[in-house]
Amino acid sequence: MNTSRSIVEVGVAMVLKDRFSQEAGKISGSFRTMMNDMNTWNRGIQMSASNTMDFGMQLVGGMARAYKYSAGVQNEVWTASKIAGATIAEQREMLQLAKDVNEITPLTASDVASGQRYLAMAGNKFDAIKEMIGPASKLASIFTMPVGQKGGVADLMTNIMSMYQIPMTEAARVTDDLYTAVTNANISLTDLAQSISYAGADMATAGVDLRQTAAAIGVLGDMGIQGSMAGTSLANMIRYLQLSLVNQKKKGYNALADLGLSPDEFFDAQGNLIDLYTIYQKFAKAAVDLPSRIETPTFFNIFGVRGNRGMLPVLRDIASGRDKMGKILATYDQNIGAVNRLNEERLKTDAGVIDQFESSIENLTVT
């Protein structure tokens, strides 16, 4: 209060002196400058205090978010380890694995940990999870999909491998095969997995492997027959074919004879069905120049309505010379190691370098 009064008194004195001095204008200007400087200084103190408070709140908030994120990652790993029956040492290794995978992919440690949980939920133990999470995460990064959560790559991949009883040690090869099938046809990984969920049981029972099944799904996908529709078509096709071959479907058995096909040529020496691509080729050859008046009832009697959708589109594709199934089958071996190679190439790009930097910062919060 005294300070404010002394300032006012000085101001009044200056104004009074202005009336009797030739320097009156300068003095009034000096006073205004002094007051402006003092106001600026006062606002600066207030802003500094406010900024300090804001910074402190942001710092505390950031620490809270980091702690919450770290706790979330550790909880995912803890849950996965309990489901998988892992030891304490294996649980720690799973946490470190989530951080390691985070550093070589654009995925978050939280997403990777979620992927581990879904692998565990599918019945995989620690060793299998360790084999699968890296390849699954790399495939997820290529397809810009999550590796965790329901419908993520880990979930889809373990379902497919379980359907065909593929050892988890072959996870890297499976990701290469899935990458090849998806990138050579008009389907997504989700489409492919859904088709396999409908067709896989019948295909696997008939001895048709993942590569051939995925290649056939790719051909149908190019023609708009995708997802469950493709899977249902292929399941009916292979099922009715086998029934026709052993004369349990009498009209189908007779239709095979009308095409000049013998049931014996569809089985190997051990009595197992020959490979799917060769089956398609045999029917494609038999159907050449066959008039629709004969083709329609003949193939209906063998494969039924839905089964025809899994046979005729592929035959037309082969007859056209496009032969997408043959091309996909030939590409599988060429693409061995493709997922790992593409992931390494991406890490060398500007986006990859940024991702690695962000991952390193993220890993600091996961302790």
What do the predicted segments below correspond to?
Residues 125:
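SIR2/sirtuin NAD+-dependent deacylase catalytic core
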Residues 16, 28-31, 52-104, 114-122, ...:
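Small-residue helix-packing and pore-constriction motifs in hydrophobic alpha-helices
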